[in-house]
Amino acid sequence: MNSSQKIPWGIQAQTGVLTDVLLGKPDHFRWVPLNSISAVTFANQQPMNYRFDKDTAMRQHQRMVEVYKQNGVRCHFAESDEGLPSSVFTRDSSFMTPWGAVIASIQTPPRRRDYAVISAFYRSAEIPIWKWITADHFEGGDFVIIKPGVTLLGWSGDRSTRNGAEQVAKWMDEMGWEAFIVPIPPQFVHMDAVVVMLEKGLALVCEDALPAYAIDWLDKQEIRRIPVSYRDCVKLGGNLVSLGNHRVLSMAHNLNVNAQLKAEGFEVYAVEYEMFTLGGGGVHCSCHELHREPD
């Protein structure tokens, strides 16, 4: 796509063929305290010999980009900023809707100004910013489109808050969309670690992270579930990306989840990504879908 062409934007669902994705540049990425996942990494650096390696991180991120391109996905990049080392996790700083992008309000201190690089991208790309979160905090990882017209909103208190989720729910209602709000335990960070849509009517779900009424609601929405264990979920086992047409971007350490997906007939592209997962985010955290073809 040359500079004179408009970047496609807008999604009705988080399934369907992914055509355009927003990624962050990892130039200034490093480990900083973000969430319970990165807290465990810092606590175990000596006994587990965890060491951040910049060259490895750059190679792993580039390999992820190559998988997108091999699958026909156009990759767009928000600029890096030395003061925003975690802005590479573009899932959280905004989320796409049919009406334009929503700029998130991130609670964790190292990321509170991620909106600067993300909003700059939308302005330069001439993609409309539909809303800004102003009622406390809500992050893009807690916005899940179950199917066109139906959303699942999460909040843990440590990141997204109930007030933030309710603001998004109000906007959805005004547009004739349903929004179902569910609290999640803080160790899962965001709803996208708990429920990830794979294709129309099919999701990866960590049932241990959800109250029974949320499982009942998914059943009423006719969503078939592939279960993810608690053990795998807290290691970002469900944090993967549907590419559409029965293709999935996953991570190499997701042995159980990848095997389940292959048994379901999915083509699984599993990349090494530990420099980022140890820093608090997986491949789903690292992308933001700008446009998908309808299912």
Stretch-by-stretch model annotation:
Residues 1-295:
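The feature marks the mature, well-folded catalytic cores of soluble enzymes
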